[in-house]
Amino acid sequence: IVGAGDKALSFDGQRGFCLYRTIGPYLVVFSDPVVRSLAERSAFLDALFAFAGQLDRRPAVYQMSLDWIPVLHDRGYDFFKLGEEAHVKLANVTLEGHAGKMYRQILRRAERDGLRFRILPPNDVADQLPQLREISADWLQAKELAERQFSIGYFDDDYMRRYPCAVVESTSAPCRVMGFANLLEGPDRQEL
């Protein structure tokens, strides 16, 4: 996420750092700040809020975990839900039985339609960038959207080259990528 280049870093000595971006009158912190210990959260926020004041910005937070809510609430923050996040244990996902019926149907249809799924290693992504860029632009145009950047990301060749990319592609000649998702692995390869 740091490598996307659309966020700045704020450091507070040895205490920690956070990703942020100034948007209008706000200094918006993205995700949890990284601190040496939970005991240092309050002091880190004090320094961060002072930094926001130096920039004549009001601090705001986006996508922080529940661990930070009590500390922020003590500073007068109110919260509202914005978006969804899911964690799925892949070991529990099955194509068997009633629970997997919908997924089996999707896979059979994809096979009938001549589609396959694969994950491109970072070294192979560069060759597909023109197709991926075109798919991204077409999707944005169809949805009448602009690149989201800060929270959802944006298409960037250099960023795409660094990570694996999941693709759905046609199996008929000429093979063409139909859709994609860049993959960012979490700690110990336990999250994507």
Q: PLM features: what roles do these ranges have?
A:
Residues 39-50:
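Conserved acetyl-CoA-binding loop-helix of GNAT-fold acetyltransferases
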